[in-house]
């Protein structure tokens, strides 16, 4: 029998972090052993839905002095995410990251650290398996249509627009098509920005409001027909099968893997 994979969560007190801890506690072959969060005001956190408590520290370096996991799951944002990932790599701890806001330069730095140390990292903008499949299919469909719109909507607390997943979908579409899409440019735009952002001819639209978690919709257009692909995440639990899949995969990785599609064997597309 394979040993249990021990997991800690960075951002453990956040909504996603709390959900990851609960998922890890329920996942066969995985054991949560700690959490880190800058808002930590105690030395432990009780995992929601269980009677289990794990050590909690304000920083990963402090947590590693108490409990050093096999894998850290990180859903923090931007600069904090990069520093957390590099801290884990330097400590020999593998990382599954769902953080958005990492620049190409950040990703290259992470790639170099991972390759040099042999410590695996999985970075993905979306861990919902359906979103990964949508991205893969959108890349295929792009070969056969000249026009496309991409619409995404999220909860009102999301800090970036468009979403990292939307950008990954758009990149997969251009990769699949091999060229820019055709685009209708309005002669008269009475409300500036109505046509959305322009990504290689794809009109990209973002909505933010309460009551939503995540929705991505791709609409392709051709003479006399449209093709619509939609993925909805109704709650944060929708991401957990993908996160746990990443946890079990990254323990065997020795470099940076970008996109859950590459874990699933669906090619280069990268949510």
Regions found by a protein language model. Name each.
Residues 78-79, 101-102, 126-127, 209:
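Short glycine-rich anion-binding loops that position phosphate/pyrophosphate groups of nucleotides
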């Amino acid at each position: 029998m394979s040993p249990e994979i021990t997991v800690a969560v960075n951002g453990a007190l956040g909504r996603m972090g709390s959900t990851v801890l609960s998922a890890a506690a329920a996942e066969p072959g995985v054991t949560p052993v700690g959490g880190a969060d800058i808002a930590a005001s105690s030395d432990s956190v009780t995992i929601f839905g269980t009677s289990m408590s794990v050590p909690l520290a304000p920083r990963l370096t402090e947590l590693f002095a108490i409990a050093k996991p096999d894998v850290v799951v990180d859903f923090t944002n931007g600069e904090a995410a990069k520093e957390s990932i590099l801290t884990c790599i330097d400590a020999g701890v593998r990382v599954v990251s769902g953080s958005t806001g990492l620049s190409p330069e950040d990703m290259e730095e992470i790639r170099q650290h991972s390759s040099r140390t042999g410590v695996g990292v999985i970075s993905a903008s979306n861990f919902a398996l359906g979103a990964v499949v949508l991205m893969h299919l959108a890349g295929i469909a792009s070969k056969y249509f000249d026009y496309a719109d991409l619409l995404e909507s999220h909860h009102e607390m999301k800090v970036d627009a468009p979403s990292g997943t939307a950008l990954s979908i758009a990149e997969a579409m251009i990769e699949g098509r091999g060229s820019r899409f055709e685009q209708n440019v309005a002669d008269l735009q009475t409300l500036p920005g109505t046509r959305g952002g322009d990504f290689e001819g794809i009109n990209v639209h973002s909505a933010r409001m309460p009551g939503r978690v995540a929705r991505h919709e791709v609409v392709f257009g051709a003479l006399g027909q449209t093709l619509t692909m939609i993925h909805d995440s109704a709650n944060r639990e929708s991401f957990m099968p993908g996160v746990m899949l990443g946890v079990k995969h990254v323990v065997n990785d020795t470099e940076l893997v970008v996109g859950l599609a590459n874990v699933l064997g669906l090619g280069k597309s990268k949510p």
